[in-house]
Amino acid sequence: MRIDVVSIFPEYLAPLELSLIGKARQDGILDLHVHDLRSFTTDRHRTVDDTPYGGGAGMVMKPEPWSQALTAVAEARRGHQGKPVLIVPSPAGERFTQALAHELAGEEHLAFACGRYEGIDERVIEWAGEHFDVRPVSLGDYVLNGGEVAVLAMVEAVGRLLPGVVGNPESLVEESHSDGLLEYPVYTKPAVWRDREVPAILLSGNHGKIAQWRRHEQFRRTSERRPDLLEVFDAGKLPKADRLALQELGYDIVDGRPVRRQGTAEPAG
């Protein structure tokens, strides 16, 4: 996979040289290029922003440097079928999820446009649609100073799904959000630490019961911490053990979705 990132702070992306993503770059699994937007300006001050039409606070990123930068990125796709995907981090975008990370991991070429100030001139987004599949994406319902932090998170979330990046592929299957639920709690040695014991079932050697306990803990933790995930969880084809786990937590299955039973207290969390 090729990834291009355009930013006025290219040094912000330095962490992508570390850990598993850095190793994936060294191994040729991930071809990552970071571009300085100011390199695509033409004035001696390397200006990338200007005042907004209509007034208002803040500055807006100028269209021409962005068009030059994105044209250069699109050139890398010449000779290939289809458009690259351009991710524009924005609090006004669709929410970034594990499902979206899996979708993007199937693409050959991703580009990221890191906005700053009040954002990028909207005409850039419209124009870019001629050359890219443009997708404004939000990490969540909050505002950051720029897109770089979001890009770090998204590149890692997508990159680690590529074959060969994570050493044990099975770990990707058991993670939070991989099946719409949060991950179960994990423990390591010693078995007793500061008078706190590892759950006995994990020391039993009974792999079937361990798997059942972990699944139950997924439902419990999701119910306590992210009940919104259960509201959209597809429970229509759950095995009997999973249905019993949900019932114990105060949920009934209605039209294929878990619904909290009336009179059941909301989970603490």
Swiss-Prot record:
Matches recorded under Gene3D superfamilies: 3.40.1280.10, tRNA(m1g37)methyltransferase, domain 2
Keywords in alphabetical order: Cytoplasm, Methyltransferase, S-adenosyl-L-methionine, Transferase, tRNA processing
Subcellular location: Cytoplasm
GO biological-process terms attached to the record: tRNA N1-guanine methylation
GO molecular function: tRNA (guanine(37)-N1)-methyltransferase activity
Catalytic activity entry: guanosine(37) in tRNA + S-adenosyl-L-methionine = N(1)-methylguanosine(37) in tRNA + S-adenosyl-L-homocysteine + H(+)
Stated family: Belongs to the RNA methyltransferase TrmD family.
Protein name from the UniProt record: tRNA (guanine-N(1)-)-methyltransferase
Native organism: Pseudarthrobacter chlorophenolicus (strain ATCC 700700 / DSM 12829 / CIP 107037 / JCM 12360 / KCTC 9906 / NCIMB 13794 / A6) (Arthrobacter chlorophenolicus)
The gene coding this protein: trmD
